């Protein structure tokens, strides 16, 4: 995401 959290590639907020 645009925020600095670790998330899967498909979660683009």
UniProtKB/Swiss-Prot annotation:
KW Methyltransferase (keyword) present: no
Modified residues (Phenylalanine amide): 13
Keywords in alphabetical order: Amidation, Neuropeptide, Secreted
GO biological process: neuropeptide signaling pathway
GO CC term (a single one): extracellular region
Subcellular location: Secreted
Coiled coil: none
Sequence similarity: Belongs to the FARP (FMRFamide related peptide) family.
Protein name from the UniProt record: FMRFamide-like neuropeptide AF11
